[in-house]
């Protein structure tokens, strides 16, 4: 909800508002919503959304999934304090290559083959990596210089290490669920008039935004209950 205008041909400014949503990827319900000026960075709105979920909703959430625009250390720390795991795309930010590790921060062997993510120990918050499959026929395998298992505590660097580990198939599968947020955004804009806010004052625009999110959740709840009843009738 923003608009750009030219000022003296060279300068531009933004006015308007922005809605920030925390969406359940499985249910597609809006769990938490925040209304702000159009200039607020999405990353700065994330921690209030996370705290709102923790304080008001008692849900057995395991992961917080976000794109690279939310790759900030404070967000990882907040998710960790909530007892959950961050599945956030990594924004490299001109960082140099780390010797001894691949692009997903998994350790590599002498021949630069990546160790494979094996498991996560929640008690010690430790990721376990095992030997690469290439070690089976490597001449260095029996020389005693290659480590069979690597263990890394996720708290050593919350940005780089999470459970499941970056680059693993499990991590990729969880990250794909983030598309649910885009679907909800599309629903709100196309069917609930969120893309057609005509108010210039923040108070009225916020009421419009709150009503849209409330009506969406109510409609979703009604549709889900009807589906449950229909399924029960079919079984009976």
Where are these regions (language model features)?
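Alpha-helix capping/termination and helix-coil
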Residues: 54-57, 72, 83, 142, ...
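An anionic, glycine-rich sequence signature occurring as long contiguous blocks
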Residues: 81-199
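Basic, amphipathic alpha-helical segments enriched in Lys/Arg and hydrophobic/aromatic residues
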Residues: 169-236
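Polybasic low-complexity intrinsically disordered regions
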Residues: 1-81, 91-94
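Short, solvent-exposed polar/charged micro-motifs at secondary-structure junctions
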Residues: 74, 97-98, 208-210
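Residue-level marker of positions within ordered structural domains that often coincide
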Residues: 26, 51, 143, 193, ...
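Acidic/polar loop patches that form or flank catalytic/metal-binding clefts of enzymes
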Residues: 61, 87-88, 223
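Short, low-complexity, polar/charged sequence segments that are solvent-exposed and flexible
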Residues: 40-41, 52-54, 83-85, 105-108, ...
């Amino acid at each position: 909800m923003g608009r750009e205008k030219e000022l003296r041909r060279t300068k531009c400014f933004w006015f308007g508002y922005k809605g920030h949503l925390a969406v359940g990827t499985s249910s597609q319900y809006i769990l938490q919503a925040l209304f702000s000026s159009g200039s607020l960075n999405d990353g700065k709105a994330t921690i209030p959304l996370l705290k709102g979920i923790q304080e008001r909703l008692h849900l057995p959430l395991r992961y917080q999934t976000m794109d690279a625009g939310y790759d900030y250390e404070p967000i990882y720390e907040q998710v960790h304090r909530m007892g959950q795991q961050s599945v956030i795309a990594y924004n490299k930010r001109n960082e140099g290559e780390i010797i001894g590790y691949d692009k997903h921060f998994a350790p590599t062997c002498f021949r630069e083959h990546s160790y494979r993510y094996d498991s996560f120990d929640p008690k010690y918050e430790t990721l376990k990596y095992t030997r690469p499959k290439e070690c089976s026929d490597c001449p260095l395998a029996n020389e005693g210089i290659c480590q069979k298992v690597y263990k890394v505590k996720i708290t050593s660097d919350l940005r780089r290490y999470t459970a499941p580990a970056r680059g693993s198939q499990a991590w990729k599968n969880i990250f794909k669920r983030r598309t649910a947020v885009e679907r909800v955004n599309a629903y709100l804009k196309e069917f609930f008039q969120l893309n057609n806010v005509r108010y210039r004052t923040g108070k009225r625009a916020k009421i419009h935004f709150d009503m849209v999110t409330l009506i969406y959740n109510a409609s979703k709840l009604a549709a889900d209950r009807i589906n449950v009843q229909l399924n029960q009738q079919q079984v009976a």
